[in-house]
């Protein structure tokens, strides 16, 4: 066969050449692995273009990017869970900008493609406690380009995705009605299929009850298909929980005579979708109660539930749209509270207690969808799901808004008691003139940003006038002691920015949840996430972080995610959860320090210490050999030359001052060192209740060690790498 003529393809080094007389040019010589320079510690370092193919011969802490392999190697973990795998929409890659398609969060070490087994592996988060080395040229160039970034990083936090942007912007548009002759059927079906998310509610007999998009004529065929699949599994004494079709995820939840289905192209896990379906089910129970629902279907299996639910479509649609836009409250199953000084909140709480009426069950003050204060009976707490329903009714749906300043609403709170009704008195305050009754509220679903509502809930049906009198006394007292003015200032101030909470922080946004209080807080979305699309993208990232941390059987406590445009951290302990996002140029050390400062501002001092003790096993990747002579150690420490230590500062010093001085040493550099064996022994003896989760596996002669499988980063300023 005659040799091929013409230009040859570009080689791996990017150098193109022309063939000479039909003979391909010779390939460059293969470089020796031992002579290759090591890659810098960050994938964002600036390098000169190589003149020949270069291989990486040293392990690196950076993961390979799935969207563009720098070395032409594609590695995927086909066993990635459904909850974390990427989904696409109409060809658009909808990923949360993770460093890999694989679930690398469960591993300790990561390597660049083609370098497995070469060199010693590094911790996936190791450089948080290390020091990144940059050449003088890199530092000079980065400083010269610094003025070009600034707040412009807000536009590059997430890469553009025109198809997803267009689909999301049309997500909340109503689907056209199908004409009588069916001439526009194809166009209507395209509109329906283009929606990113659907919620369907149907009876066990297959009768449609609710659909977020489309009328009965449009969804009847789909309802029939879904019911057939569910019935097939039920006939085999099995339960259908979910399935995937192409890039669409279906999640099914059966609740007595009802089947609820979530259909989504958004990156959400099954557990997150089930939480949303549970909220829709609770919304139905808040109208009917569980005994009424069961009685209706016991009498007739094909009962049409749309008649008793008539008028509640607005509430269901408001919930569904909130889930599609992204709801931090639903994701964390927690409530957001209005930021107030402790003295102001104490005054409001005392005022509620002093003015409460005899038949009051729950009393709440809510401002702009955030909880200000609540009074309740002992041993009777309000379920977060119940409060979500109330807030959705007041601040999202339009049903209560049409009633003006006060309303008397019978409703069922399923989390409190799903068998009966309570009665809620709702009064909206005019902050400019609190004693005057508000005559008319905004008719839009958005409402006013500074709305304040007083909610008084009673089990007595005839207590309307009693609760109204309590409301008048409450408002008068709040105005007299200055609480109205404090709430007005807090509402108008809004959420603080990240830099207001942590000055100089590179964070763009974060979510912090207090597990014990079932509350969360977050900074303002502005100026980096101002529109609904940017907020949805941010929630996509939070969804993935939340899924990676909480999906069983993993036991992750710290999860780090790196992408081409952002870097994120998820941190979960028995006391709190933290999710933080920063631009990709942010170092892991800066991200960890900012996360630690947030914890310091949110946790009380005692909880900070407990968190430190309880997460000793989440320490850094490597610890230096002990600088002290062997004779200075306990007998158990002498059995291994390379004894591991931790280096701590003020927290450990304070702990030592409290009575553990005998367990500390000073290194030749005057840095505090504490042997892990001694810490483990002391914690087992003196802090056993606090440190049950921190107990380390026993080595020879009972010496406590940290095995490689347990190495995780603990991003706290009081723990540093030696």
UniProtKB/Swiss-Prot annotation:
One of the GO biological process terms: protein targeting to vacuole
Gene Ontology cellular component terms for the protein in this record: fungal-type vacuole membrane; Mon1-Ccz1 complex; multivesicular body membrane
Membrane topology: Peripheral membrane protein
Biased composition (Polar residues): 9-21
Key words, A-Z: Autophagy, Endosome, Membrane, Protein transport, Transport, Vacuole
Segments for region (Disordered): 1-58
Subcellular locations according to the entry: Endosome, Multivesicular body membrane; Prevacuolar compartment membrane; Vacuole membrane
Family per similarity comment: Belongs to the MON1/SAND family.
Protein purpose: In complex with CCZ1, is required for multiple vacuole delivery pathways including the cytoplasm to vacuole transport (Cvt), autophagy, pexophagy and endocytosis. The MON1-CCZ1 complex acts at the fusion of vesicles with the vacuole, through its regulation of the SNARE complex during the coordinated priming and docking stages of fusion, and particularly at the stage of tethering/docking.
Protein's name in the database: Vacuolar fusion protein MON1
Organism: Phaeosphaeria nodorum (strain SN15 / ATCC MYA-4574 / FGSC 10173)
């Amino acid at each position: 066969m005659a040799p091929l003529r013409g230009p040859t393809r570009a080689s791996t080094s990017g150098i193109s050449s022309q063939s000479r007389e039909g003979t391909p040019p010779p390939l460059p010589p293969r470089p020796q692995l031992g002579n290759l320079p090591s890659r810098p510690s960050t994938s964002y370092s600036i390098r000169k273009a190589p003149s020949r193919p270069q291989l990486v011969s040293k392990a690196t802490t950076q993961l390979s990017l799935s969207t563009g392999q720098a070395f032409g190697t594609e590695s995927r973990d086909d066993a990635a869970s459904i909850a974390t795998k990427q989904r696409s929409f109409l060809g658009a890659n909808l990923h949360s900008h993770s460093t890999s398609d694989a679930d690398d969060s469960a591993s300790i070490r990561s390597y660049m493609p083609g370098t497995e087994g070469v060199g010693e592996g590094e911790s996936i988060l190791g450089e948080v406690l290390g020091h990144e080395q940059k050449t003088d040229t890199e530092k000079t160039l980065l400083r010269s380009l610094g003025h070009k970034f600034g707040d412009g990083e807000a536009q590059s936090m997430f890469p553009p995705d025109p198809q997803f942007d267009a689909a999301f912007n049309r997500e909340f548009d109503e689907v056209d009605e199908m004409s009588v002759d069916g001439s526009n059927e194809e166009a209507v079906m395209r509109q329906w299929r283009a929606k990113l998310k659907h919620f369907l509610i149907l009876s066990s007999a297959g009768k449609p009850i609710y659909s977020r998009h489309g009328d009965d004529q449009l969804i009847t065929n789909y309802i029939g298909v879904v019911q057939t699949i569910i019935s097939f599994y039920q006939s085999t004494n099995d339960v259908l929980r979910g399935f995937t079709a192409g890039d669409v995820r279906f999640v099914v939840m059966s609740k007595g005579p009802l089947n609820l289905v979530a259909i989504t192209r958004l990156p959400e896990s099954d557990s997150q979708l089930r939480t949303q379906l549970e909220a829709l089910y609770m919304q139905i129970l808040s109208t009917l109660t569980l005994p009424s629902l069961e009685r209706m279907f016991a009498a007739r299996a094909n009962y049409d539930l749309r008649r008793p639910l008539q008028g509640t479509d607005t509430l269901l649609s408001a919930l569904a749209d909130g889930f599609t836009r992204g709801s931090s409250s639903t994701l964390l199953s927690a409530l957001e509270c209005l930021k107030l000084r402790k003295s102001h909140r104490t005054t409001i709480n005392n005022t509620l207690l002093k003015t409460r009426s005899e038949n009051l069950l729950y009393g709440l003050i809510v401002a702009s969808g955030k909880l200000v204060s609540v009074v309740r009976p002992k041993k009777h707490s309000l379920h977060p799901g119940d409060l979500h329903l109330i807030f959705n009714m007041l601040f999202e749906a339009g049903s209560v808004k049409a009633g003006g300043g006060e309303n008397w609403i019978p409703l069922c709170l399923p989390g409190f008691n799903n068998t009966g009704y309570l009665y809620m008195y709702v009064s909206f305050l005019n902050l400019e003139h609190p004693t005057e009754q508000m005559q008319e509220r905004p008719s839009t679903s958005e409402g006013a940003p500074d709305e304040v509502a007083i909610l008084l809930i009673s089990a007595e049906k005839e207590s309307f006038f009693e609760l109204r009198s309590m409301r008048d006394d409450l408002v008068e007292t709040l105005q007299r002691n200055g609480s109205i003015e404090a709430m007005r200032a807090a509402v108008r101030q809004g959420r603080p920015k990240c830099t207001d909470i942590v000055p100089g922080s590179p964070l763009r946004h974060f979510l912090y949840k207090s597990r014990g209080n079932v509350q969360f807080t977050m900074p303002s979305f502005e100026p980096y996430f101002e529109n609904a699309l940017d907020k949805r993208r941010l929630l996509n990232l939070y969804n993935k972080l939340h899924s990676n941390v909480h999906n069983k059987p993993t036991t992750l406590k710290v999860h780090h995610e790196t992408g081409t445009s952002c870097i994120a951290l998820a941190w979960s302990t028995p006391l709190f959860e933290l999710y933080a996002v920063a631009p990709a140029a942010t170092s892991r050390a800066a991200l960890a320090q900012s996360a630690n400062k947030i914890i310091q501002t949110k946790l009380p001092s005692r909880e900070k210490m407990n968190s430190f003790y309880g997460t000793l096993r989440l320490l850094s990747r490597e610890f230096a050999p002990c600088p002290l002579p062997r004779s200075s150690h306990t007998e158990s420490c002498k059995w291994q030359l390379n004894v591991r230590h931790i280096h701590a500062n003020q927290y450990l010093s304070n702990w030592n001052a409290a009575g553990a001085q005998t367990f500390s040493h000073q290194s030749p550099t005057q840095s505090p060192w504490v042997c892990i064996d001694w810490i483990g022994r002391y914690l087992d003896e003196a802090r056993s209740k606090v440190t049950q989760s921190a107990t380390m596996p026993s080595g020879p002669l009972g010496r406590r060690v940290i095995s490689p499988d347990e190495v995780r980063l603990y991003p706290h300023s009081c723990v540093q790498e030696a």
